[in-house]
Amino acid sequence: MKAFWRNAALLAVSLLPFSSANALALQAKQYGDFDRYVLALSWQTGFCQSQHDRNRNERDECRLQTETTNKADFLTVHGLWPGLPKSVAARGVDERRWMRFGCATRPIPNLPEARASRMCSSPETGLSLETAAKLSEVMPGAGGRSCLERYEYAKHGACFGFDPDAYFGTMVRLNQEIKESEAGKFLADNYGKTVSRRDFDAAFAKSWGKENVKAVKLTCQGNPAYLTEIQISIKADAINAPLSANSFLPQPHPGNCGKTFVIDKAGY
């Protein structure tokens, strides 16, 4: 099923002229009074290792994972999460509840809850085949039996009325910018090695300035710790522009990776 979904999308791209689907402006049609997005990127080998270590059912994207020539390609898209809108906060909703329930938060937006245990039960996103093909290259859990893109849109996109192509196209673009940055090169160059948080921060600072290191939250699992996710806080009013030193906002916590961690490689 996964292969069919991807192959159909790739065929569609070959039959269509190139368009700027992934360059459509991302604009909230409602609840647009928030100040930031969190770009969540998985270190895919670490994510799969964490699922294995916790005896979770192996996802197709982990079972089929293979080595790649460009190790930066293991930096994949998890999601793009709008911050808490002021209009929702005014109804008594705090950050913790917003991040847990997203668009299903009560009393508003109060959409049907998207559950991680039943991601394929979430509605189809309405993505164009062209954008779906591009997304499948950077979000291994999209389509197939994982349906990550359905879950992410239902939880973090639907209540804002985001155009699905703009929403996921923005993720594709930002993922590419991070992979091509000094931080992306650092991850690729240190594949399978133990690194320091200080050196990672220095790589990020080379691209976007020392003051923006606080925009990054790193998540690790295991002992010794290995990287599973990178979350980057981006100003809402900068989301449609290429990343620059003026794009970021600080996060309240740097994450749990500690002073050193492993850039995990493929395999268990």
UniProtKB/Swiss-Prot annotation:
Keyword Acyltransferase attributed: no
UniProt-listed GO biological process terms: RNA catabolic process
Database matches in SUPFAM superfamilies: Ribonuclease Rh-like
Disulfide linkage: C103-C159
Pfam families for the chain: Ribonuclease_T2
Catalytic center residues: H78, E152, H156
EC identifiers of the protein: 4.6.1.21
Keyword Lyase: yes
Key words of the record: Cytoplasm, Disulfide bond, Endonuclease, Hydrolase, Lyase, Nuclease, Periplasm, Signal
Alphabetized PROSITE patterns for the sequence: RNASE_T2_1, RNASE_T2_2
CDD domains: RNase_T2_prok
Superkingdom as given in the UniProt entry: Bacteria
GO function terms (MF aspect): Enterobacter ribonuclease activity; ribonuclease T2 activity; RNA binding
Subcellular locations according to the entry: Periplasm; Cytoplasm
Post-translational modification: Contains four disulfide bonds.
UniProt signal peptide: 1-23
Reactions this protein catalyses: RNA containing adenosine-cytidine + H2O = an [RNA fragment]-3'-cytidine-3'-phosphate + a 5'-a hydroxy-adenosine -3'-[RNA fragment]
Cellular component GO terms, alphabetical: cytoplasm; outer membrane-bounded periplasmic space
Gene3D superfamilies, per database record: Ribonuclease T2-like
Recorded family membership: Belongs to the RNase T2 family.
Functional summary from the UniProt entry: One of the few RNases that cleaves the phosphodiester bond between any two nucleotide. Shows a preference for cytidylic or guanylic acid.
Subunit annotation: Monomer.
Protein name as it appears in the record: Ribonuclease I
Species annotation: Escherichia coli (strain K12)
Gene that encodes the chain: rna
